[in-house]
Amino acid sequence: MKIAILSREPNNYSTRRLVEVAQARGHQVEVLDTLRCYMNIASHNPSIHYEGRELESYDAVIPRIGASITFYGTAVLRQFEMMNTMALNSSVAISRSRDKLRAMQLLSRHGIGLPVTGYAHSTHDVPDLITMVGGAPLVVKLLEGTQGIGVVLCETQKAAESVIEAFIQTNNNILVQEYIREANGADIRCLVVNGKVVAAMRRQAQPGEFRSNLHRGGTAEAIKISPEERATAVQAAKIMGLDVAGVDILRSARGPLVLEVNSSPGLQGVEAASGKDVAGKIIEFLELKASRKHKPAE
């Protein structure tokens, strides 16, 4: 196959691994800087141009679109889809999962376990909002945040009121969530590929920190997940419409609680912790998806 990888960082571990594995399996791979792609949105002959040339057709595209460029990145991916290029994850599914509020509402509708989560617009409603999620301590999250940025643990009612009011008054959209104390600064990242958990790791926050993101100094180790956790991760990815996803789960007294469903999960931490060839599983699935697309009707 001829595969395009949309990535702003060709030397990023995840991008390099996908290139290496795909090439080792006989595929032709080109890494394209997402923001350098530009589009001709024509009715009969849509095209994508890159560095002064019109791109030839590809069999498949792997989107590695960062959260900060979701709008433009999904537009580029839609253009590939208009040109009948098969996408590892669809533009619709990526957009759905990147909207954290919408994602929470969809997961809630399907009965997936979640931390109690509040959303409000007016500062007049802050005291009741805090009560609604169980009071302090609680967690405030910027809807546009990523890698633990814009996530604040408020340990008292006064601190919670101040932080929430400050965010709202500066026109930031936030979620207010209950703090799951029994998780003890740890979460589980499940890598789901084609409806199966192919790898999992437990991420533990640094002492004095509650955010377990590896970008914030958290550590990772292999973990054996329960059947309920496995089913929750698979179902969460399915609800988002993602064939490849990183599903973040907290262990709580009332079972697994989903924090986030990531459409472009990093591979370095989970491959190192689990010892699993996740990149290989992704390329194998891409091959399977391509074979299904080109299989003649019976």
Swiss-Prot record:
InterPro entries linked to this entry: ATP-grasp, ATP-grasp_RimK-type, ATP_grasp_subdomain_1, RimK, Rimk_N, Rp_bS6_RimK/Lys_biosynth_LsyX
Binding locations of Mn(2+) 2: E260, N262
Chain positions recorded as Mn(2+) 1 binding sites: D248, E260
PROSITE patterns associated with the record: ATP_GRASP
Domain annotation ATP-grasp: ranges: 104-287
Binding site for ATP: K141, E178, Y179, D187, R211, S212, N213
Residues reported in the UniProt entry to bind Mg(2+) 1: D248, E260
An individual GO BP term: SOS response
Cofactor entry: Mg(2+); Mn(2+)
Residues that hold Mg(2+) 2 according to the record: E260, N262
EC numbers: 6.3.2.-
A GO CC term assigned to this protein in UniProt: cytoplasm
Keywords: ATP-binding, Ligase, Magnesium, Manganese, Metal-binding, Nucleotide-binding, Protein biosynthesis
Gene Ontology MF: a single term: ribosomal S6-glutamic acid ligase activity
Cofactor: record remark: Binds 2 magnesium or manganese ions per subunit.
Listed NCBIfam families: PRK10446.1, rimK_fam
HAMAP family according to UniProt: RimK (MF_01552)
Family: Belongs to the RimK family.
Protein known as: Probable alpha-L-glutamate ligase
Species whose genome carries this gene: Aeromonas hydrophila subsp. hydrophila (strain ATCC 7966 / DSM 30187 / BCRC 13018 / CCUG 14551 / JCM 1027 / KCTC 2358 / NCIMB 9240 / NCTC 8049)
Gene designation: rimK
